[in-house]
Amino acid sequence: MASITHRRNAVLGAAFLMATSAIGPGFLTQTATFTNTLLASFGFVILLSILLDIGAQLNIWRIVIVSGKRAQDISNAVFPKAGYFLAALIVMGGLAFNIGNVGGAGLGLNSIFGIAPEMGAVISGIIAILIFLRKEAGLLMDRFAQLMGFIMVVLTFYVMFKTEPPVVEAAYHSFIPEQIDPIAIVTLVGGTVGGYITFAGAHRLLDAGIQGEKAMAEVSRSSVSAILIASTMRVVLFLAVLGVVSKGVSLNPKNPAETPFEYVAGNFGQVLFGVVIWAASVTSVIGAAYTSVSFLTTLCPTIERNRNRWIIAFIVISTVVLVTVGKPAAVLVFVGTLNGLILPIALALILLAAYRSDIVGTYKHPVFLAFSGWFVVIIMAILSGKTIISYISSFFS
């Protein structure tokens, strides 16, 4: 019974860890901004991105778990040193985004208690560190992610209900959009399963001892659940923002996602949004640190033996940089652009591994999953490549 309970908790915990890692301050801002631009047609973008997210994540999680190896080890088996390259991209991207996550947590406590954002960032960093000071850090991380995810969705759902969004119109344009923005699709897919995010849950399952072909049903369920949890938050926030925008309310350009909360609850709405952005940010801090370090553990035995200390160091560095330097905009933009390449590169390596018996044994990867995976690789590679070329051109102009 204990083993069954442990597996169920691990499967649920992995889903919430991945989902709450995706729901960070950038997730909230992007959702509000695109809703303001595309209005009800943003529902179509969300729907399409959900399908692409599921296609990408199912491929990655199933192959990682059936092989019993972390993504960097699979990559090294496919191409020598490819795992080191992937790990470098993940860690750079994870650190850059974690600086933003710590900043978001600081802003959240500033909205709730009125303390300085820098002090809020330090307090949030300490709270995240406390989890990894305990021996049962994995279980605490799972439970914390579940609690924060529940709080975020419930508060945002309340705000959505109060803004009275045009649900019928949103549902209609989710299938028949008036306009389509390819950049919005790429941004949503990259923000949900890009970078370190999709590997958070897969590596968590491995750490919980869930691996092998016999675990495929659990893994598929956890993988899809993670996408649906993150997407539920996006849909609810989309409708909340659509509710105020459809009434002619202009979004606050400094913090667009906060607008529906203020519309519903006035000044207290800032406190409500503070709770949401803090929960979103601090869980992303934890997810980014945990997953980034998980990409180094098998490449360096010293890190494996002192994993929690390295996770704590990762959080400390992110917090110190935020407090002393702030958000180094140029670095964040550049690393964020590189981060867009992680999904097509990592997914391509994982898909190549699916046909290597020395990696997956006798496992037969479903053809339709492989097809959907390669489709995501091609689309994301093209659009991410265009973004990087545009960035380099603007840098030298």
Swiss-Prot record:
Q: Which InterPro entries match?
A: NRAMP_fam (IPR001046)
Membrane topology qualifier? Multi-pass membrane protein
The keyword Transmembrane helix is assigned to this record: yes
Q: What is this protein called?
A: Uncharacterized membrane protein HI_1728
Subcellular localization, as worded in the UniProt entry: Cell membrane
Cite a single GO MF annotation. Answer: cadmium ion transmembrane transporter activity
- Which superkingdom? Bacteria
Entry keyword set: Cell membrane, Membrane, Transmembrane, Transmembrane helix
Q: Name one GO biological process term.
A: iron ion transmembrane transport
Q: Which parts of the chain span the membrane according to its record?
A: 9-29, 38-58, 85-105, 112-132, 148-168, 182-202, 226-246, 271-291, 310-330, 331-351, 365-385
One cellular-component annotation, GO = plasma membrane
What is the similarity comment for this entry?
Answer: Belongs to the NRAMP family.
